[in-house]
């Protein structure tokens, strides 16, 4: 069989494979994908930024896996983490509480917040940087599917394209077997 035919077969089986394996204990096809500016993505992966800010988000992601997409010019999946806790509060209180873990200056924080009356502070833990950042162009080629990065975030399991992309990224990075998973 040609490589293309074999690869197509692999991609068809990928969702089942992804459910059977994990990175850091999290399924490869669950969680949320966050778009992050490259400078902040790098700080998160280095452990220098432990709080990610969002103007809009959902508390349903607390305790869940988060995958990071570094926006242009990097345009790559860079790693993942777990959202330990989500705090929603007035911007002044968020800054006061987390300024040393936000990874930006007060001026940049204020510019981002703008006129928002509340902001979400996502406490990140269990950060797993990918050994090599995986460019969206490489994933688009491997999946033969255009990937449109989310403006802010999206559910991985609700996006067939991103579910496949994140699964491939996990396979390229390295995976471990889920305890108790069924045999393939």
Place the predicted regions along the sequence by residue:
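Contiguous surface segments at macromolecular interaction interfaces
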Residues: 1-31, 35-57, 62, 73-78, ...
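Non-catalytic, usually N-terminal nucleic-acid engagement modules in DNA/RNA processing proteins
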Residues: 67
